Each structure stands twice: as C-alpha cells, then as structure tokens.
UniProtKB/Swiss-Prot annotation:
Substrate binds at residues 78, 152, 173-174. It catalyses: S-adenosyl-L-homocysteine + H2O = S-(5-deoxy-D-ribos-5-yl)-L-homocysteine + adenine; S-methyl-5'-thioadenosine + H2O = 5-(methylsulfanyl)-D-ribose + adenine; 5'-deoxyadenosine + H2O = 5-deoxy-D-ribose + adenine. Pathway: Amino-acid biosynthesis; L-methionine biosynthesis via salvage pathway; S-methyl-5-thio-alpha-D-ribose 1-phosphate from S-methyl-5'-thioadenosine (hydrolase route): step 1/2. GO terms for cellular component: cytosol. This is 5'-methylthioadenosine/S-adenosylhomocysteine nucleosidase. It comes from the Bacteria. It comes from Yersinia pestis bv. Antiqua (strain Antiqua). InterPro entries: MTA_SAH_Nsdase (IPR010049), Nucleoside_phosphorylase_d (IPR000845), Nucleoside_phosphorylase_sf (IPR035994). The lineage of its organism: Bacteria, Pseudomonadati, Pseudomonadota, Gammaproteobacteria, Enterobacterales. GO terms for biological process: L-methionine salvage from methylthioadenosine; L-methionine salvage from S-adenosylmethionine; purine deoxyribonucleoside catabolic process. Its EC number is 3.2.2.9. GO terms for molecular function: adenosylhomocysteine nucleosidase activity; methylthioadenosine nucleosidase activity. The active site is at residues 12, 197.
Amino acid sequence: MKVGIIGAMEEEVTLLRDRIENRQTLARAGCEIYTGQLNGIDVALLKSGIGKVAAAMGTTLLLEHCQPDLVINTGSAGGLDSSLKVGDIVVSNEVRYHDADVTAFGYEPGQMAGCPAAFVADEDLIALAENCIQQLKLNAVRGLICSGDAFINGAEPLTRIRAAFPTVAAVEMEAAAIGHVCYLFNTPFVVVRAISDVADQASHLSFEEFLVVAAKQSTLMIKAMLTTLAQRG
C-alpha cells in the first residue's frame, strides 16, 4: 500500500517530511513530492502550495507519478462549527467549493458545471480517522469542509458562506480541489485538518499564532492513521 499525503504549506508538511525514511524528492512545477517510508507505510508526501490551482496541479502530479492507493489531505483550517477550538480536528464527510457560482444554469451553490455538487470522502478513511481520534482523545467534528481562493477574515464572507452552506464545519483553500481531482482519478480520499483559527474578524491574527499548534495536531493524526494502516497489513 502507498499513501498519498497532501499539505499546502511548509509548516504543514515539515514534521512529516523530516520523519520519512529513505526520502527522495521530486520537484515539479512549484510542487515538491517526498517519497519513502513513514510509520511502516510507503508514502508520497506532497507540498502543493496554497490555493485551488496549486492543489489541483499538485494532486494530479502526485496521482500520475506516485499512484497512491489513497489520499489524505492534512494541514490547518478555519473553524466555523461552534464546538471547534484551536487544535481540534475536522474530518471531511464531503468537500465543496464556496466560491463557485453557476447557479444561473441550475447548479447548486458551489457546484462546478458538469461536476457533482460535493466530492464525498471515503467512508473507510473517515472511520480510520475517527478511530485514531478516539485513541488520541482529541476533540473532533465530522462535517462539510468548504474551499475557496480567499482567507476568510470578516463578517461579510462568513455570512455568505454560512447562508449558502448551513452545515459547513470548516473553511480552507485546497480541500475541494484535492477532492475534485481524486474524484476524477477514482482515488479514495479524506481531509483531516486541525483548526488553526476560528473564522472571525481576527482570524488572520490567530492563524499566524496557532498554525504551529495545528500543524502538530494534524501531524499527530497522520502518524496515527499510518500506524493503524501498517498494523492492518
């Protein structure tokens, strides 16, 4: 088994990359892919860059060059669920774009033309993540994660997103693009992110302060998931 792991930023991948054994690096089109073994599993760790285009391009390179059996998107997210606080975990049941709008042609908010309204995470991977959450005794929510090419900071975008997606648990900038590409490649995926900020008017300040906390928590989750997969054989 080979596991693809995707993080957007240096802070989101460095703790994992430093632990990869027999590490090799592929640099292509602004992305870096690190291959080797981590916690007993063959891995391909992608640092994609920030935003939907970077995430889609990097995920495509990862799937084409490394052909992982599954993909886990790690990193940080802004919490919209009222129960979430910094360091808590959000696990995707589905991902959607919050900044796509072709509703004039009969599509749902966030739905791209010719595509599903949502990209649904793999149930077995969700169960794996939630099992690890229980083992680690972390606070977590399973729910909708919405993505767009904007850092959500202020009342107006929050109001718009919550109105269009009432069940949204968290927002960030890559997950829906990753889910979109995995859907096209028929590759199972799940998003497991740690909350770095609560999406309010001061979210940019808390993001800068707590990104390291979120990176440590999401890394803890990835390592636990890999260990469980290795034990299953």
